[in-house]
Amino acid sequence: MSTHGWPVRSLAAQLRLPSGPAGLLVARRLNRNNREMVLAAVEATGAVPGERVADVGFGGGSGLALLLARVLPGGQVRGVEVSRTMVMRAKVLLRRPIARGSLTIELGTATALPFAAAALDALITVNTVYFLPHLEPAFGECARVLRPGGRLVICLGDPVEMADMPVTAHGFLLRPVSDVQRALTAAGLALDGHRRAGQPPFSFHVLTAHRP
């Protein structure tokens, strides 16, 4: 597949910022293709009932439902997305937990999270780091909203394998995993683990850290 065709560029744009009818289709694709990564991220939080957790850049929203299953009863999930289309979709599909107060959905960015300091016990973000021009400000914001001891889980595709995907030639920043780890420590987070999972050509990395 050419890296320059309109369909590839269009898909890249939708993966970066899902919007409109095409964005709704992309949401379903995200839930299907990212399922293993999202499951791994949610599991790595170690979240338990009563905790306050967030999914930043929740995309198709599958992580929100999985987090709810872990923290209820008594807990709360907060979802943040830069895409208005994804926010509106999630508010419709997940209106029941929203009405009960166990889920909030908000428009926001990774560098300006709509949370108070030390508001969260855990936070996940899956397949988002490729769209951040600078990692340290975003990770610093994660550190701000986590309580002391609060956990951060980042899942990202293997950068070497992703470089062979035509879509990543259009606006994806594919960094070595070691660069992501360095940005985490520079933001004041303590690294806890790094696990490689999945199978080529869709291997991925699960990074865990916490706020000291």
Model regions and ranges:
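Short glycine-dipeptide loop
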Residues: G50, P73-G74, L146-R151
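A short SAM/SAH-binding and catalytic strip from SAM-dependent methyltransferases
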Residues: D121-L135
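Conserved class I S-adenosyl-L-methionine
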Residues: R151-Q181
